[in-house]
């Protein structure tokens, strides 16, 4: 699995673990649900600032996003 898709998968799991919807997360980051969905689907890659902000929101570390099974 390519890295962007794996990060997206881990992002989705972290969001679900927090009980949040894509729409709720997108609202916090001032983007549409469709835009946020592209991160979870590995279509768009996250920049450093986005990674840090999402990790803070989901209470995970950047390493958690990059873990590959």
Segments predicted by a language model, with ranges:
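DNA major-groove recognition helix of helix-turn-helix/homeodomain DNA-binding modules
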Residues: 49-64
